[in-house]
Swiss-Prot record:
Pathway: Amino-acid degradation; L-arginine degradation via AST pathway; L-glutamate and succinate from L-arginine: step 5/5. Its cofactor is Zn(2+). Its EC number is 3.5.1.96. It comes from Acinetobacter baumannii (strain ACICU). It is an enzyme of class 3 (hydrolase). Pfam families: AstE_AspA_cat, AstE_AspA_hybrid. The active site is at 211. It catalyses: N-succinyl-L-glutamate + H2O = L-glutamate + succinate. This is Succinylglutamate desuccinylase. One of its GO terms (biological process) is arginine catabolic process to glutamate. Belongs to the AspA/AstE family. Succinylglutamate desuccinylase subfamily. Transforms N(2)-succinylglutamate into succinate and glutamate. One of its GO terms (molecular function) is hydrolase activity, acting on ester bonds.
Length: 324
């Protein structure tokens, strides 16, 4: 098996599309899609995805390195694994996305958009993940880690978002995120069209979207900054004990509301460079627009993913409250 990332960036296929290593078999399922199945019995089926936004390169490089050490025999695979490089079309152009945000296309969201390379890719990703889980052992617990980096700075640099779900959240997933030294966990309060919502909703996978720092071009990442999550991912796929957390207790937030841009004249009371987890207190105005201002009713809230430049009708930010 040649370099997973290089093949994907070049739009090429490996010389052979399947093969066997010392302790697992593998299949190239298509561009940026690699399935690995241990020869021994396994009790977890794990999806690791990166590059759903094409310019978020550090997680892509982490998955590429993971693939390298697995194929070199330096790490023993103990779970059934699907490696996903989400949006090769945007990766090659160094863009977050080319036409529309792929991470808002899942759960059939692509059907409501014009047919583009990216909408077709979302459909392929849904079908590939569905087949992967359906062909895995019926006894295997299902997991999905979707790795991202952010387009803005953050007062809490690394965090995970859990999709809204009615079934209980998985303790092993939470433990792995704590062990990865993430700063915060954020629980969504409504259904969405993200990749992790798709896997959670349709396959009851324990799913999380991880935000792991700042987006930089390929080759400019200091991967030592991602050592904790890299170690945890390797321990998850090799079924080794998780490392001990080195940071203070992880902070926990709940999404309490979404800021929806309803009018063209929409202004947020944040600077363009304001970091994630910027705060507002009771009575302060977060956003103004003719159809009505957003005034804080709680004692304190935090803002995540503020973006006043979204299209009308879309979410311009998340409003969070902290769970004590």
């Amino acid at each position: 098996m040649q370099d997973f990332l290089a093949l994907t960036l070049q739009g090429e296929q490996p010389a052979t599309r399947e093969g066997k290593q010392a302790n697992f078999s593998w299949r190239w399922l298509g561009e940026g899609l690699l399935e690995c199945t241990p020869h021994a019995q396994y009790d977890k089926a794990v999806v690791l995805s990166a590059g759903v936004h094409g310019n978020e390169t550090a997680p892509i490089e982490l998955l590429s390195h993971l693939c390298t050490v697995l194929f070199a025999g330096r790490l023993k695979l103990a779970v059934r694994l699907l490696l996903v490089l989400g949006n090769p079309y945007a990766m090659r152009q160094g863009k977050r996305y080319v036409h529309d945000d792929v991470n808002r296309m899942f759960c059939g969201g692509y059907k409501n958009l014009p047919v583009t390379e990216e909408s077709k890719r979302a459909e392929v990703l849904e079908q590939t993940v569905a087949t992967f889980f359906q062909e895995s052992s019926s006894q295997a617990k299902r997991y999905h880690y979707d790795l991202h980096t952010a387009i803005r700075a953050s007062l809490l640099p690394t965090f995970a978002l859990f999709p809204y779900q009615t079934h209980s959240y998985d303790a092993d997933l939470t433990a792995s995120l704590e062990a990865a030294d993430l700063d915060a966990l954020v629980y969504h309060n409504a259904v969405g069209k993200t990749f992790t919502h798709f896997t959670s909703e349709n396959f009851k996978a324990a799913s999380a979207t991880l935000e792991l720092g700042k987006a930089l071009p390929f080759g400019q990442n200091d991967l030592s900054q991602f050592a904790s999550i890299d170690e945890v991912i390797r321990n998850v796929v090799s079924e080794q004990a998780l490392p001990v957390r080195n940071k203070p207790k992880i902070r926990v937030f709940q999404v309490s509301d979404s800021l929806i841009k309803r009018d063209e004249e929409f202004h947020m009371n944040l600077s363009a460079e304001a970091p994630n987890f910027s705060t507002f207190t009771k009575g302060e105005i977060i956003a103004t627009q003719p159809s009505g201002n957003y005034v804080v009713e709680q004692d304190q809230v935090w803002i995540l993913f503020p973006n006043p430049n979204v299209k009308i009708g879309l979410r311009a930010g998340l409003v969070l409250t902290e769970t004590i």
